[in-house]
């Protein structure tokens, strides 16, 4: 039969084991709490990094044309897929070409130029042909006056005033989702324009204002001629030529098509790639618009 001293010794050992067990549990709790904090911290960091990366991706083109004159932002899908909707069919509105306005923009004109005639503009003839002579070859254009008359009116005015002559095309994109050559900026940095702006037309005008579909990609097919912009209704002089099917939200006014000779010239330019590598930047093959005229 154990003595009192033995019982006390046993009780001490039992208490010691309990205290050690509690201390061990406490240490595990601290480890778990710290680990949880680290996990949360890592999750927050990952979220922030992801947000920054997505933000940079989303604003990449705006940054490239920083003072935010004219930019295109392709949708962040890996490639053109059959599920992407085509451009909507054109349905003329009752006010098409009735009141074209060209108010001053925030930036001064990159070259001396007068704004086009405002007010009502004709939608006839339905198409107007133009020739863009470049140092890389001719690019024939067919302007769609029946669908985007305010845009064609501006383009024709700038062409007649020689605004585009002896200017360089400052941007080429070669990604799977965006293949365009961008021109129309005498400053050659993505910020130049004519000193005025005007509203979007087709295909933007085929949707109700603030329609969520305006933010969803549609297919801008090879051979499309469209306006670059820095946001809704900020069109100026910069335009882009689509040399392979591209995904963009329908917020870039389509005002014509590119003829076969032009597509051959664009293919040659695109084959040269980007001057600094990558898939977006000044073309390695320098492109100068020597003259642009209506036929």
Swiss-Prot record:
Isomerase is among the record's keywords: yes
UniProtKB keywords: Isomerase, Rotamase
EC number, as in UniProt: 5.2.1.8
Disordered as annotated region, ranges: 105-128, 274-295
Location of the PPIase cyclophilin-type domain: 126-294
Database matches in CDD domains: cyclophilin
Keyword Isomerase tagged: yes
Family membership noted in the UniProt record: Belongs to the cyclophilin-type PPIase family.
Name of the protein in question: Probable peptidyl-prolyl cis-trans isomerase B
Species for this entry: Mycobacterium leprae (strain TN)
Record lineage: Bacteria, Bacillati, Actinomycetota, Actinomycetes, Mycobacteriales
Gene expressing this chain: ppiB
């Amino acid at each position: 039969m154990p003595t009192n001293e033995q019982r006390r010794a046993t009780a001490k050992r039992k208490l010691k084991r309990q205290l050690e067990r509690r201390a061990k549990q406490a240490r595990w709790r601290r480890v778990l709490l710290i680990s949880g904090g680290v996990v949360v911290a890592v999750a927050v960091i990952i979220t922030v990094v992801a947000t920054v990366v997505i933000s940079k991706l989303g604003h990449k083109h705006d940054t490239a044309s920083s003072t935010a004159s004219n930019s295109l932002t392709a949708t962040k899908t890996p490639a053109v897929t059959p599920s992407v909707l085509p451009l909507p069919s054109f349905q003329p509105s009752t006010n098409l070409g009735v009141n074209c306005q060209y108010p001053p923009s925030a930036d001064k004109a990159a070259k001396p130029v007068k704004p086009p005639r405002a007010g009502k503009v004709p939608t006839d003839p339905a198409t107007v042909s133009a020739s863009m002579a470049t140092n890389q070859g001719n690019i024939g254009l067919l302007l769609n006056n029946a669908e985007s008359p305010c845009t064609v009116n501006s383009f024709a005015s700038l062409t007649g005033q020689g605004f585009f002559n002896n200017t360089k095309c400052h941007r080429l994109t070669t990604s799977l989702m965006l293949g365009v050559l961008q021109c129309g900026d005498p400053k050659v940095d993505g910020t130049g324009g004519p000193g005025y702006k005007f509203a979007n037309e087709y295909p933007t005008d085929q949707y109700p204002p603030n329609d969520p579909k305006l933010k969803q990609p549609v297919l801008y097919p090879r051979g499309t001629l469209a306006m670059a912009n820095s946001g809704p209704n900020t069109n100026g002089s910069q335009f882009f030529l689509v040399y392979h099917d591209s995904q963009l939200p329908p917020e870039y006014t389509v005002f014509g098509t590119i003829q076969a000779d032009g597509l051959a010239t664009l293919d040659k330019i695109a084959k040269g790639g980007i001057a600094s590598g990558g898939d977006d930047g000044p073309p390695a093959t320098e492109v100068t618009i020597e003259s642009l005229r209506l036929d």
